[in-house]
Curated annotation (Swiss-Prot):
UniProt similarity note: Belongs to the CinA family.
Pfam family, one: MoCF_biosynth
NCBIfam families: cinA_nterm, PncC_domain, PRK00549.1
Name assigned to this protein: CinA-like protein
Organism, as annotated: Synechocystis sp. (strain ATCC 27184 / PCC 6803 / Kazusa)
Length: 416
């Protein structure tokens, strides 16, 4: 038995709203061990909704709808489902009373069109909404088919899912197995290069291993169906350790780890501090660091040295370095890193200088050329050269530069 998620709303098709409901429900279905192979997004059109139901009915036995439960004329989910299964609607008195009470709490009378939200197909059970006015339903229109409907508001949907739908599904025998996944995260290696290193793992059937690209990183998802999360972890653990050993320093964390959170944890463990000097990233590196709770333990501050005179006056970069090597150069990056480390009194200094575009590139230093300087606790400076090209644009170059700068520091911390 499989489930299919059907999200209703023209605003979703137009890209006006991020469809976070489908992501959440997919994760929840995996947690409950309910197979889920398809998702559908359909606009507020009765005939197209019916076609979506007909298609989903052929390949799933649990249909989960979100959206289209409001009081306006374009909220059509409930009546369209009822019409598809040729079932009349009936007004639920308890829903009317609940909606009236919620309006009374705000000092307003219930609008006439809200009565529409109390209509449910004959035989359907109420899926109560504790916070909003749009209830859902639990309905078996056919013996081998379960329909669950939820409002499109994510907070309401999640509360109804956890509070009502999950207990119901568990009472029907679901949730006895789980599909647990662990995501391994890698930095400084491309998806194809990583795939070559771990290709033998892709043929496994339990657990399964699959690569996918994240923003500025590569990820491997290891998934395992099992009777419990603890058992799934036991199965996954040795596979994950093998992959991490093969990847070496290209592996930086798992699941919710970010490159900034890992760097922060390493600095905190060592009792060390860092400061940053940024040119083309304009504060992006500092932002990644300060996104982490408690980052004041190890991050002392930074200088945005966009103008060359700021590099000279605030960071102490020798004017001759800029004149003869250029503002975008290994020498300037190293001098900036040393300067910010010395002036802020930290153990480490990181600096970024580069050409993010869309202008400023030359044949010698094209757009996407970025130098990262690193000053260590011994006062020694080093650098790496990043060459992104200009295909993905300015913001992508800036973001990747900040991530790669942190990764450069991570590798030094983990190897020293």
């Amino acid at each position: 038995m499989a489930a299919e998620i059907i999200c209703v709303g023209t605003e979703l098709l137009l890209g006006e709203i991020l469809n976070s409901n489908s992501q959440y429900l997919a994760q929840e279905l995996a947690r409950l061990g309910i197979p889920h192979y398809f998702q559908t997004v359909v606009g507020d059109n009765p005939e197209r909704i019916k076609r979506a139901i007909a298609i989903a009915r052929e390949r799933a036995q649990i249909l989960i709808f979100t959206g289209g439960l409001g009081p306006t004329p374009d909220d059509l989910t409930t009546e369209t489902i009822a019409d598809f299964f040729r079932t009349p609607l009936q007004e639920n008195i308890a829903v009317i009373a609940d909606i009236e009470a919620k309006f009374a709490q705000t000092g307003r009378p219930m609008a006439a069109n809200n009565r529409k939200q109390a209509l449910l197909p004959l035989g359907a059970e109420l899926l109560a909404n504790a916070t909003g006015t749009a209830p859902g339903m639990i309905w078996h229109p056919q013996p081998d088919l379960l329909i669950l409907t939820f409002p499109g508001v994510p907070s309401e949907m999640r509360q109804m899912w956890q509070g009502v739908a999950v207990p119901y599904l568990q009472s029907q025998g679901w949730g006895k197995t789980t599909i647990y996944s662990r995501v391994l995260r890698f930095q400084g290696i491309g998806e194809s290069a990583l795939a070559e290193k771990v290709t033998d793992f892709f043929t496994l059937t339990n657990p399964t291993v699959a690569p996918y690209a994240g923003k500025g990183e590569v990820r491997l998802r290891i998934s395992c169906p099992a009777s419990s999360e603890a058992l799934a972890k036991e199965i996954i653990d040795p596979i994950a350790e093998e992959i991490k050993a093969i990847a070496g320093l290209d592996y930086f964390g798992q699941d919710e780890d970010t490159i900034a959170s890992v760097v922060g944890a390493l600095l905190r463990e060592r009792g060390e501090t860092v400061a940053v000097a940024e040119s083309c990233t304009g504060g992006g590196l500092g932002a990644l660091l300060t996104d982490q709770p408690g980052s004041s333990d190890y991050f002392w501050g930074g200088v945005i040295a966009y103008y060359n005179q700021v590099k000279i006056k605030l960071l102490g970069v020798d004017p001759e370095i800029i004149e003869y090597c250029g503002a975008v150069s290994e020498a300037t990056a190293e001098a900036m890193a040393l300067g910010v480390k010395e002036r802020l009194g930290t153990d480490w200094g990181i600096a970024i200088t580069g050409i993010a575009g869309p202008g400023g590139g030359t044949e010698e230093k094209p757009i996407g050329t970025v130098y990262v300087g690193l000053a260590d606790p011994h006062g020694q400076a080093s650098h790496i050269l990043l060459q992104f090209g200009d295909r993905r644009g300015r913001e992508w170059i800036r973001y990747l530069s900040a991530c790669q700068a942190l990764d450069h520091l991570r590798r030094r911390l983990q190897s020293s």
